[in-house]
């Protein structure tokens, strides 16, 4: 019974706290929200305001990227007109192939036409016959065979 005597005072304090006094600084969460659309509008406005305050870093980075990669750079070597632009290693490969063919034709000038037309297979069994020099870098001496 002791607890029932305190019940009306607790109920009075609870009801007093629930009263919405406009002059007090307590927030009233459900007083102005008529529907959920107002909350969505406020969230969108807050998001837009935060985006508009940020610096324009993305645009600056994009402008720097375009400026850097759109400039024409002066080539280090003279460019031949009429040829499409090619990677320098591809030019080097063409030069190496030309050099290989030149050495092949110089070596071939020492050989006679009879060397290519002979049908004696026993003479060529003792020594290997290469059109180009071997891949391991050694030069063949036909005199030592």
UniProtKB/Swiss-Prot annotation:
Implicated in the regulation of circadian rhythms through autocrine and/or paracrine actions. The modification Asparagine amide is found at residue 136. It is found in: Secreted. The keyword Membrane does not apply. Belongs to the NmU family. This is Neuromedin-S. PANTHER family: NEUROMEDIN-S. GO terms for biological process: neuropeptide signaling pathway. Keywords: Amidation, Cleavage on pair of basic residues, Neuropeptide, Secreted, Signal. It comes from the Eukaryota. Residues 1-25 form the signal peptide. Residues 26-64, 65-100, 101-103, 139-145 form a propeptide. Its main location: secreted. It comes from Bos taurus (Bovine). GO terms for cellular component: extracellular region.
């Amino acid at each position: 019974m002791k607890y029932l005597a305190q019940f009306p005072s607790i109920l009075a304090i609870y009801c007093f706290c629930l009263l919405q006094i406009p002059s007090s600084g307590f927030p009233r969460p459900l007083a102005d929200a008529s529907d959920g659309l107002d909350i969505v509008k406020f969230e969108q406005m807050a998001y837009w305001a935060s985006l508009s305050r940020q610096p324009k870093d993305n645009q600056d980075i994009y402008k720097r990227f375009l400026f850097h990669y759109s400039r024409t750079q002066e080539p280090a070597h003279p460019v031949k007109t009429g040829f499409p632009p090619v990677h320098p290693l591809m030019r080097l490969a063409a030069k190496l192939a030309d050099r290989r063919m030149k050495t092949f034709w110089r070596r071939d000038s020492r050989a006679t036409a009879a060397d290519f037309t002979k049908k004696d297979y026993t003479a060529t069994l003792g020594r290997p016959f290469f059109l180009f020099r071997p891949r391991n870098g050694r030069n063949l001496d036909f005199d030592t065979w």
